Amino acid sequence: MTTNSWHSILVIYLASLALDWSLEMGIHLEKSAYLALAGNFLRSNELSKVIDVVKEMVKSQHSLGVYHGAMLIHMLGFGRRPSLAAEALDLLPDDQKGLSAYTALMDVYISAGSPEKAMKILGEMREREIMPSLGTYDVLLSGLEKTSDFQRETSSLRKEQKSLVASTRFREIVHVEDKICM
């Protein structure tokens, strides 16, 4: 093994040890420590450990934030772990389960070849009265166009997207989450 391989193994081991020790001792870490641990586990592809870190963050009443939450969902999906991405969404407080987090999870499901789950997430999002952005439509349409099972939904989504484009031209205020999903 190379020196870099040993270094990576040691860093992962020490990060796991730090997390386990804090859990065992009942110690709540600072937000930056949780984020550093999550980053180490993401880089080493220890994705289930990332979820453990996020659970502890939530217990310690630290917030991932809208951006980090959506990025985490996206990265877990990129690691081909859609179930962990869905779990990450569930761990977010309701006020952070917004447009960017839902769009990220839809992208995960589309990438995993499960457009029906992406459509279910769209339904949940609409039930919470969160309106899709142009980026949300792009994600859905790119995945649904590859399958013949959702032709009616694809047509409907395309009409909604065109309507949103027309109304967005006259909108003066663009929300942060809309910018993230563009």
From Swiss-Prot:
How is this protein named in the record? Pentatricopeptide repeat-containing protein At2g01360
Q: Provide this UniProt record's keywords sorted from A to Z.
A: Repeat
Q: Which cysteines are joined by disulfide bonds?
A: none
Sequence ranges of the PPR repeats: 30-64, 65-95, 98-132
List where the protein spans the membrane.
Answer: none
Highest taxon of the source?
A: Eukaryota
Q: What family does the database annotate?
A: Belongs to the PPR family. P subfamily.
Read off the Pfam families from this record: PPR_2
